[in-house]
UniProtKB/Swiss-Prot annotation:
It is a multi-pass membrane protein. It comes from the Eukaryota. The gene is SRD5A2. This is 3-oxo-5-alpha-steroid 4-dehydrogenase 2. Optimally active at acidic pHs. Its EC number is 1.3.1.22. PANTHER family: 3-OXO-5-ALPHA-STEROID 4-DEHYDROGENASE, 3-OXO-5-ALPHA-STEROID 4-DEHYDROGENASE 2. One of its GO terms (molecular function) is 3-oxo-5-alpha-steroid 4-dehydrogenase (NADP+) activity. It comes from Macaca fascicularis (Crab-eating macaque). The chain crosses the membrane at residues 8-28, 72-92, 146-166, 206-226.
Length: 254
């Protein structure tokens, strides 16, 4: 049975992402994992970082991958399937590579459940729109929005992966010591990994030219931007020799 596009869930889901992003900025507190676990009660249940990240990120891959699996196989099929494939590539890496290499602190269980719900909902929203609602002209693959958007997506993913690699090298297995990250975009900002992911989703919003992707990019800017800001304050407080010229998220600006 062919699924018909319904605009109501698309609009509702997009509005929810925007509202969540605005709420993050209003609360102005970082989510309590990683460097900011001290904000939680000591008795809070925690899971090992690798298992936690795997469980949390899995729906963002499994939901769109499951929907894609029901579509006709084609390398350059409808633009919606190709763009959703890019979404799956990002979350394949986050689920099966990043999570298994993670050397972070134990992750609060309550945040895992929130993350699973968010990832499942957002994964479905992006998939539903691109597969059942999006309509692109025949020349979309050569459109400047698609080309520039995909370029930014790949660039941002490269920055994100390279920055995560730098962070992993700062800590030996089992260590919880923090050190000053150096190299790559960390030369200019404290949140190089966050900047890379933000660039990714801005590029994705441009390439898809869709409301759900734009709403997700907005949420990412709010959530990751705030986290970069608090990471920057953390480093400045912990290290007296932290580079004073380094910014939080945007080189030379913020």
């Amino acid at each position: 049975m062919q699924v018909q596009c319904q605009q109501s869930p698309v609009l509702a889901g997009s509005a929810t992402l925007v509202a969540l992003g605005a709420l993050v900025l209003y609360v102005a507190k970082p989510s309590g994992y990683g460097k900011h676990t001290e904000s939680l009660k000591p008795a809070a249940t925690r899971l090992p970082a690798r298992a936690a990240w795997f469980l949390q990120e899995l729906p963002s891959f499994a939901v769109p991958a499951g929907i894609l699996a029901r579509q006709p196989l084609s390398l350059f099929g409808p633009p919606g399937t190709v763009l959703l494939g890019l979404f799956c590539v990002h979350y394949f890496h986050r689920t099966f590579v990043y999570s298994l290499l993670n050397r972070g602190r134990p992750y609060p269980a309550v945040l895992i459940f929130r993350g699973i719900a968010f990832c499942a909902g957002n994964g479905f929203l992006q998939s539903y729109y691109l597969i059942y609602c999006a309509e692109y002209p025949d020349g979309w693959y050569t459109d400047i929005r698609f080309c520039l958007g995909v370029f930014l997506f790949i660039l941002g993913m490269g920055v994100n992966i390279h920055s995560d690699y730098i962070l992993r090298q700062l800590r030996k297995p089992g260590e919880i010591t923090y050190r000053i990250p150096k190299g790559g975009l960390f030369t200019y900002v404290s949140g190089a990994n966050f900047l890379g992911e933000i660039i990714e989703w801005i590029g994705y919003a441009l390439a898809t030219w869709s409301l759900p992707a734009l709403a997700f990019a907005f949420f990412s800017v709010c959530f990751l931007g705030l986290r970069a800001f608090h990471h920057h304050r953390f480093y400045l407080k912990m290290f007296e020799d932290y580079p004073k010229s380094r910014k939080a998220l945007i080189p030379f600006i913020f």
